[in-house]
Structure formats: structure tokens, C-alpha cells
């Protein structure tokens, strides 16, 4: 979390169970996210690109990017912050 706090504000962690989904949406801020446990797949720009994140992976999502997500078979825990 210390590394994330050095590059973003409003840092927090969240977890989801296996197979949970987020519908397509956007944010008005840039999101910096690290996968801590499990796995999650982010689907960007209406299926144009997929990012499979596992522990240790980092993603920077620009403000306004349409994205959805699918949690992996073992669930996931991520930390994120905004800038």
C-alpha cells in the first residue's frame, strides 16, 4: 500500500468472490490498481482489449475509459488509488 500511496490518493483495498462481475462503466479520475491476491480480468473499450491481472500486476486506467471486469475462479483482492 505504501508504494501505491506514493503515486495516488484515496487508496483503499477491496475484494470480490469468484466469478463476480462489474458491468461496463467509466470514472472521471485516473485509477491506479494493483492485484494483491487471486485474479481479475478487465475488459477495456467494449471488448477491444483484455487485461488479465494476477498478484503483483499493476494497471493504470485513464479517466473516461469504458471498462468492465470479471473476477477469477479464486476471487480477488486489489488495492487502488486515484489521481
PLM-predicted stretches and their roles:
Residues 5-6, 23-25, 42-43:
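Short loop/turn motifs at secondary-structure junctions and domain boundaries
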Residues 43-45, 70:
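A generic structural motif
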Residues 47-63:
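Short acidic-glycine-tyrosine-enriched beta hairpin
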Residues 63-83:
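Ligand-binding loop in jelly-roll beta-barrel domains
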Amino acid at each position: 500500500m505504501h508504494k501505491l500511496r506514493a503515486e495516488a490518493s484515496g487508496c483503499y483495498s477491496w475484494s470480490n468472490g469468484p466469478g463476480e462481475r462489474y458491468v461496463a462503466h467509466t470514472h472521471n479520475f485516473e485509477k491506479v490498481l494493483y492485484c494483491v491476491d487471486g485474479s481479475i480480468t478487465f475488459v477495456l473499450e467494449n471488448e477491444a482489449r483484455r487485461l488479465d491481472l494476477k498478484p503483483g500486476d499493476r494497471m493504470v486506467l485513464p479517466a473516461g475509459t469504458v471498462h468492465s471486469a470479471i473476477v477469477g475462479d479464486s476471487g480477488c483482492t486489489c488495492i487502488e488509488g486515484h489521481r
